[in-house]
């Protein structure tokens, strides 16, 4: 029964990750909250092996499932970028990946340097709740001010300067609950990208950022010390997050073409209020 409950927990977290990784609602924030609600850490590791590093690694591996969904959905774009890699070619793949690399640097540097401190100080429901509400208010004002006033409709036309500024905004997502997607989309609005282009640039930007974060987490643990059920849980969570993300990303792009982002902002505010109420009844610990 304990093993079954562990698998169910992994499925729940995989679903949450797949839904929230690319939406502007903060996947990390939702993971922290859900893990707290279902007491995920209980029974995940043998007492002799349990450390926070193992839990962090589990979270990162689950997130890789959602990241893989982007590779699958945008495989044609990725393939073309390497076929047209020469800098002199129209829609040069070299220029595209250079932009992604430049954009990834600010958050990558800060994330690697302050990874442990951020996990220690900010990975808790109270911090997430504050970030959800602050980010929602910022999203509402940014959409009103910048959405629709774009000069760049295609991510192949993003400049190095635009890419770097978007990358600087991504640093705000180091605060769990702020949302990497929300931060980068808002940054992209400010430098002139259309909403769809902003979302797609954010998707691709997740690839190197998540690879770096995952490497940082995994190098601190001995994966071979995990039990067979823990490997099964990791695999199940990875597959579930991959499948769910495949569905959500496609629907998200369709949504952005017709609907405003403030829908997600209102959800964030509502969730923040619910979390505050739950904390008052000691359901979660702030």
UniProtKB/Swiss-Prot annotation:
GO cellular component, one term: plasma membrane
Subcellular locations according to the entry: Cell membrane
Name of encoding gene: uppP
Keywords associated with the record: Antibiotic resistance, Cell membrane, Cell shape, Cell wall biogenesis/degradation, Hydrolase, Membrane, Peptidoglycan synthesis, Transmembrane, Transmembrane helix
Pfam families associated with the record: BacA
Family: Belongs to the UppP family.
Note: Bacitracin is thought to be involved in the inhibition of peptidoglycan synthesis by sequestering undecaprenyl diphosphate, thereby reducing the pool of lipid carrier available.
HAMAP family in UniProt: Undec_diphosphatase
NCBIfam families according to UniProt: PRK00281.1-2, PRK00281.1-4, undec_PP_bacA
Enzyme class: hydrolase
Metal-binding listed as a keyword: no
Transmembrane feature ranges: 5-25, 55-75, 92-112, 122-142, 185-205, 229-249, 264-284
Protein name: Undecaprenyl-diphosphatase
UniProt topology in membrane: Multi-pass membrane protein
Role according to the record: Catalyzes the dephosphorylation of undecaprenyl diphosphate (UPP). Confers resistance to bacitracin.
Gene Ontology biological-process entries: cell wall organization; peptidoglycan biosynthetic process; regulation of cell shape; response to antibiotic
EC number(s) per entry: 3.6.1.27
A molecular-function term among this protein's GO annotations: undecaprenyl-diphosphatase activity
Catalytic activity, as annotated: di-trans,octa-cis-undecaprenyl diphosphate + H2O = di-trans,octa-cis-undecaprenyl phosphate + phosphate + H(+)
